[in-house]
Structures are given as C-alpha cells and as structure tokens.
C-alpha cells in the first residue's frame, strides 16, 4: 500500500492585540468577500478580504474553529496569515459570552436597513451555535 504524506503549511491568525494561533496545518477555510476560500499547501499567492464568519483549521490533531470579524488574508505558496479585527476561539466561547456579543451586534444593527448584512450576521451566529458541541454551557 502506498504511503501518502499529507503536506502542511504555516497558518497564523493575528488580532490587533496578539498572535492568536500559529501552527503547521493541513488546510484552512476562510470567509472571504468572494465566498469560502480553502487554502492548502502550495496555494497560489493571493491577498483576500476577510468578512464576518468562521475560520476552520484542520491540523494533524483535529479541527479548530474561530469566529472572525473583518480583515485581510495573505496567502503564499508556503503559508497563510490572517490579520482580523476580532477573533474568538469557538471552544472558549460560552453561551453567556455569545449572548452578550449577539446583544451588542443587534444594538449596532438597530435601524440598519441593509438586509444583506443582517442575514450574514444571522448566518454567522447560526454557524456558531451549531458548531457540533464546541460551545459549552457557562
């Protein structure tokens, strides 16, 4: 039987406050302005705008999920870095924190007539609350 080696690349997730994640990974799915973008080793160079959504990171030890808000992705053949305005590791997000953040977003969107943004926010929170057991009761 042929032994295929999975190639890894360096993925870094950075907020204005700190380096949130830096590890060799198998793949990353990021929420770009043009849709979900899957990055793997040896990807063509690309700079992409990041929108509100979730980042799925596949590592040798499993999958990690992060909630992100706006930013930029710099993808090279040897790695990928995301600089985002806000990021939360979903496994560290409690229902109380999630409810507080939902309330803040709703307050921000009150009076906003842009249904497209409202639907994106609803889809994003739906993804978070259905993240297959990664959220824990506070």
Curated annotation (Swiss-Prot):
Pfam families: ATP-synt_DE_N (PF02823)
Superkingdom of origin: Bacteria
GO molecular function: ATP binding; proton-transporting ATP synthase activity, rotational mechanism
Statement: the UniProt record of this protein carries the keyword Acetylation: no
GO CC, one annotated term: proton-transporting ATP synthase complex
Keywords: ATP synthesis, Cell inner membrane, Cell membrane, CF(1), Hydrogen ion transport, Ion transport, Membrane, Transport
Alphabetical list of InterPro entries matching this protein: ATP_synth_F1_dsu/esu, ATP_synth_F1_dsu/esu_N, ATPsynth_dsu/esu_N
Compartment(s) where it occurs, according to its Swiss-Prot or TrEMBL record: Cell inner membrane
Chief place of localization: membrane
HAMAP family noted in UniProt: ATP_synth_epsil_bac (MF_00530)
Role played: Produces ATP from ADP in the presence of a proton gradient across the membrane.
Assembly with partners or alone: F-type ATPases have 2 components, CF(1) - the catalytic core - and CF(0) - the membrane proton channel. CF(1) has five subunits: alpha(3), beta(3), gamma(1), delta(1), epsilon(1). CF(0) has three main subunits: a, b and c.
Family: Belongs to the ATPase epsilon chain family.
Record protein name field: ATP synthase epsilon chain
Species of origin: Bartonella quintana (strain Toulouse) (Rochalimaea quintana)
UniProt lineage: Bacteria, Pseudomonadati, Pseudomonadota, Alphaproteobacteria, Hyphomicrobiales
Gene field: atpC
């Amino acid at each position: 039987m042929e032994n295929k080696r999975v190639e890894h690349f360096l993925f870094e997730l950075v907020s204005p406050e700190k380096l949130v994640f830096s590890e060799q990974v198998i793949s990353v799915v990021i929420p770009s302005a043009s849709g979900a973008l899957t990055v793997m080793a040896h990807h063509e160079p690309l700079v992409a705008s990041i929108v509100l959504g979730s980042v799925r990171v596949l590592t040798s030890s499993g999958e990690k999920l992060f909630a992100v808000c706006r930013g930029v992705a710099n993808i090279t053949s040897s790695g990928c870095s995301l600089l985002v305005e806000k990021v939360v590791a979903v496994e560290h997000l409690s229902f109380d924190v999630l409810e507080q953040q939902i309330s803040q977003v709703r307050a921000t969107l009150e009076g906003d007539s842009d249904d497209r943004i409202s639907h994106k926010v609803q889809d994003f929170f739906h993804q978070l609350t259905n993240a297959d057991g990664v959220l824990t009761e506070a």
